[in-house]
Structures are given as structure tokens and as C-alpha cells.
Regions:
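Cytochrome P450 heme-binding "Cys pocket" and the immediately downstream C-terminal segment
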Residues: 241-243, 344, 362-398
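Conserved cytochrome P450 K-helix/beta-meander segment immediately N-terminal to the heme-binding cysteine loop
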Residues: 313-340
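Conserved cytochrome P450 K-helix E-x-x-R motif and the immediately C-terminal K′/meander segment
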Residues: 41-63, 260-302, 322
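Cytochrome P450
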Residues: 1-10, 70-77, 139-152, 161-172, ...
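Central I-helix of cytochrome P450 enzymes
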Residues: 172, 176, 199-252, 279, ...
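Cytochrome P450 heme-thiolate "Cys pocket" and heme-binding signature region
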Residues: 301, 338-368, 393-395
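N-terminal membrane-proximal hinge/A-helix region immediately C-terminal to the signal-anchor transmembrane segment
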Residues: 2-111, 121-125, 151-156, 291, ...
Length: 413
């Protein structure tokens, strides 16, 4: 028995030594983890719900804006300041996605589908097709009909998705769409895609499964992130009544009460728009962006980055960096405005950058402005007695969402 224990200990020591020596040479300074689980035990100790805080902590401890570690078996590099995050997002070699993770495959029939978690030639082809045809119907640019119907369609889409990703609702919707779709019909993006499926000699990536995942990749971020941002904005208005007062005064001075605010009013309502931007900085919905993958050996910030390295842009860390923002803990929309009332450059990167820039940025900005400005024009908001009111209450995830918040609405007078 004693001999078996000694052998087991020697094997553990050997595996740990092999693990310690597996870190590629020339890569960023890192944190030593454990075999199989990597640095997860650090996260459990420091802040398992919001790992961006742990990354930021060790970035300071190691005195390096770029650090490395093992997340399970994945060698990972994390960028923690604006310069390194921006380079990571713009670097073509970092356009890959971590598509082999279990939870990513599980959502896509155990395949690489959609445009969110895929890369390479198939991703480029599918993204190009989606953007080209969706822009024909108003997505991603100014379009009067699109702007008129967007609010109604958003509610319908959210109702469709209430049971989560890839369920019978989406399949029934697609089958019904196919029945309605004529030979030359053009019923939006789905109709264009179904027409594409009828063509001969099309790339093998064009399938109904790919269409389903592409729809989800557009719809879920658009609905969840937009509604979460608006909820956070209203919650912040209750916590910061002086800001809410300035927003209301600006809207009623420019728009009045006889009509609703429109996108055309946006440049005339700089403080309102700045408040939305400050909301996205103060509460970063995607704290770690969307995880990237290095597609070939390269260098980054003076370090060697081997092929297949996992890459994380710590966007939440840069949005709370006192060296960059001065007073990041303060909710201060004025930071996005120049002295003459014009907009400063937005360094908060809420929609990413580079080839992977969020395709729905125009849609999201339009929806947030329209809904937030309309609500602020027409209602006063206050907390409900006895209900949680803490500003830090939220649910972690790829997209941070607000915790349940009870709000009392009273018509503005």
C-alpha cells in the first residue's frame, strides 16, 4: 500500500512538473495553475462570478498589461489596457473563435455553425452574405421603414426566443416561412437565404442548420444586450437623480411633449446620448468581449503568441481603469462630451472593433436611444419600497444582465 501511495505521489509530481514546463517560451508573464483545472481555483478564491476582476488584479500584481494563464487545458492570453485590447481586437491573426469548447458545440448541433463562434472561410462567406442581404432590408444603416417597425419586431422576436436558444419555436417559424416562401419571394433575410439554398453549386456551409444559428447569433445579442442596457440605464437614473434631471430637461427643451423623440433628434440631445454611452461604460455588458483564438504564430505587445492560443480582451478592466478615465467609479456622462457639447471619442469599445465589430451596432444604438429617450420623456422612475436597490446587483455571464429590479412608474408632469 505504501508503495502504491509513493508511485501515485511521484506521478502527481511528474504531471505537475510537466504542466509547469508547458508554458510556451517568450509568452506574457503568467500565473501558475494546477493540471487539468488551470487557474480556476484562483477565480473561485478571488471572484468566480466576474473573472475580469481577477484578471485585472493579477495584471497589476505582475505589473504587466498582458498576462497569460491556463484556463483548463487552454493556454490563454488576456489584454488588460486600452492599447493592448485595441490591438487584440484589430489584429487579423486574432480573428479566430474558440469553437471547440463544449458549451459552444452544444448550442449548434455539435457542429461549427453560425457567425458568432465560427471563423475561417465559412465564417467570412456566411457573414458577408448575411450583412449584404440584411442591409438590403435596413439592418446596419438608416432606413425609415426599418426604424418605424423595429420596436414592434423587437417585441415579437423576444417572445419567439422566450424559451431559449434552438427550440421548437425557431424551427416552426422556419418551416412556416418555407411554406410561405415562393419561388422568387423576397421576405427579408430568411427569404434571401432560402433562395440561396435553391441554387446549384453553392458552398457546403449553406444549410438550414446554419441559417438557424445565424438567426440566433443576430437575434439573441440584439434583444438581450439592448434590453439589458436600457434596464441598466433606467436603474442608474434612479440612483443618480441629478443625471436624470438633466436628461429630462434636455429632452423637453428640444423635443417637448407633443411628439416622441426620434433618431433625428440624437445630435440635438448630446447629454442624453452621453448618458447612454456612460451606461455602457459603467456597466460593461460583455466584460470579456467574445473570446478570440490565434490562427497562426505571431507576436503581440512584444510577446510570442503561438497558434491556437485563446485570447481575452478584458474590456471591463479598461472601462474601470483610473489611469484612463480618472474617476471610473463615478457615473458622469460629461466625460463623453467636449466643452462645446460635441461628442468626445468613445474609448469604451461597447461593440468591439476590427473585422469582428458587432454587426448590429447601428440597430442597437438606435434602439437604445429611441427607447431610453422616450421613457425619460414620459415617465418618472422610483424604487419600490422593500425591494433590492443595490447598484451592483447583476447576473454574470458572457452578457451581464441586470438583477430583477422593481420600478415604480409615474407619468411625467
Amino acid at each position: 500500500m505504501f508503495f502504491v501511495v509513493i508511485i501515485a505521489l511521484l506521478l502527481i509530481i511528474y504531471e505537475y512538473y510537466k504542466y509547469l514546463s508547458s508554458k510556451p517560451s517568450g509568452t506574457p508573464p503568467g500565473v501558475v495553475g494546477l493540471p487539468l483545472i488551470g487557474i480556476y481555483w484562483y477565480c473561485l478564491w478571488y471572484d468566480y462570478k466576474f473573472p475580469y476582476r481577477w484578471f485585472g488584479y493579477y495584471s497589476k500584481k505582475l505589473k504587466s498589461k498582458v498576462i497569460s494563464c491556463y484556463l483548463g487545458s487552454f493556454f490563454t492570453v488576456i489584454a488588460n489596457d486600452y492599447a493592448s485590447v485595441k490591438e487584440l481586437l484589430l489584429k487579423e491573426e486574432f480573428d479566430g473563435r474558440l469553437s471547440d469548447a463544449y458549451f459552444i458545440k452544444a448550442r449548434a448541433f455539435n457542429k461549427k455553425l453560425g457567425i458568432f463562434f465560427t471563423d475561417g472561410d465559412e465564417w467570412r462567406e456566411q457573414r458577408r452574405f448575411a450583412l449584404r442581404h440584411m442591409r438590403d432590408f435596413g439592418f446596419g444603416r438608416r432606413h425609415e421603414i426599418f426604424e418605424t417597425k423595429s420596436m414592434e419586431e423587437l417585441n415579437i422576436l423576444m417572445d419567439m426566443l422566450k424559451n431559449g436558444p434552438i427550440n421548437e419555436n425557431e424551427k416552426k417559424y422556419l418551416y412556416k416561412y418555407k411554406e410561405m416562401h415562393g419561388e422568387n419571394g423576397e421576405y427579408g433575410f430568411v427569404g434571401s437565404y432560402l433562395n440561396k439554398l435553391k441554387e446549384s453549386n453553392i458552398p457546403s456551409s449553406y444549410t438550414e442548420e446554419y441559417l438557424l444559428l445565424t438567426l440566433l447569433d443576430f437575434i439573441l445579442p440584439a434583444t438581450i444586450s439592448t434590453s439589458s442596457n436600457i434596464t441598466f440605464a433606467i436603474k442608474f437614473m434612479m440612483h443618480f437623480p441629478n443625471v436624470a434631471k438633466k436628461v429630462k430637461e434636455e429632452i423637453h427643451k428640444v423635443v417637448g411633449s407633443g411628439r416622441l423623440p426620434t433618431w433625428e433628434d440624437r445630435n440635438k440631445l448630446p447629454y442624453t446620448e452621453a448618458t447612454i454611452r456612460e451606461t455602457m461604460r459603467y456597466e460593461t455588458l460583455t466584460p470579456l468581449g467574445v473570446i478570440r483564438r490565434c490562427t497562426k504564430d505571431t507576436t503581440f505587445q512584444g510577446y510570442f503568441i503561438p497558434n491556437n492560443t485563446t485570447l481575452i480582451p478584458n474590456i471591463a478592466e479598461i472601462n474601470h481603469d483610473p489611469d484612463f478615465w480618472g474617476d471610473p467609479k463615478n457615473f458622469r456622462p460629461e466625460r463623453f462630451l467636449k466643452d462645446d457639447g460635441q461628442f468626445n471619442k468613445d474609448f469604451s469599445l461597447p461593440f468591439g472593433a476590427g473585422h469582428r465589430l458587432c454587426a448590429g451596432e447601428t440597430f442597437a444604438r438606435f434602439m437604445m436611444f429611441e427607447v431610453f429617450a422616450t421613457l425619460m420623456q414620459n415617465f418618472d422612475f422610483s424604487f419600490v419600497e422593500g425591494q433590492p436597490t443595490r447598484i451592483e446587483d447583476k447576473f454574470p455571464g458572457i452578457i451581464t444582465t441586470p438583477a430583477e429590479t422593481w420600478i415604480r412608474l409615474k407619468p411625467y408632469s
